[in-house]
A protein has these predicted regions:
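Sec-dependent bacterial lipoprotein signal peptides
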Residues: 1-23
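Acidic, polar-rich low-complexity tracts and alpha-helical solenoid repeat scaffolds
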Residues: 2, 21-137
Length: 137
């Protein structure tokens, strides 16, 4: 019985230790002079370590601070959609991907990087399949 309690205690301590490593920055804690590449790198590092909430904060910071930079914003939007896919939040991903595709089919499309259109279409189709939604192809 004591061994069982010890094992549970060790598991709880390990879980708390892992949770403390997954800190999520507040937007106010992110340096005001951080550039798009800085924020993207921080987001990617958070993503690679499995801290999707922190990655999302960095991408959302790009959307807020660099709203006039269409290229940076479409990349951040796509990455947020990808975060939703990783967490199997298909509805959220689908909605964002739909908006990205609409941007590429609008008048500002020539200013956007073509790679994200292709990636968004692929993930959009995948999300639609998961949600059992028929798409126009």
């Amino acid at each position: 019985m004591k061994i069982k309690h010890t094992v549970y205690l060790c598991c709880a301590i390990m879980a708390l230790s892992l949770a403390s490593c997954m800190t999520v920055p507040k937007e106010s804690e992110i340096p005001a002079d951080a550039t798009v590449p800085d924020l993207t790198q921080k987001a990617q590092e958070a993503f690679d370590s499995g801290n999707y909430r922190a990655a999302r904060v960095y991408y959302e910071t790009i959307l807020k601070r660099f709203a006039d930079d269409e290229k940076a914003c479409v990349a951040a939007q796509y990455e947020i959609a990808h975060l939703h896919i990783k967490r199997r939040r298909w509805n959220d991903a689908y909605t964002i991907l739909e908006k990205i595709i609409a941007q590429y089919e609008g008048p500002m499309a020539m200013h956007l990087p073509p790679d994200y259109y292709k990636l968004a279409k692929i993930d959009y189709t995948r999300a639609a399949e998961k949600l059992r939604i028929k798409t126009k192809q």
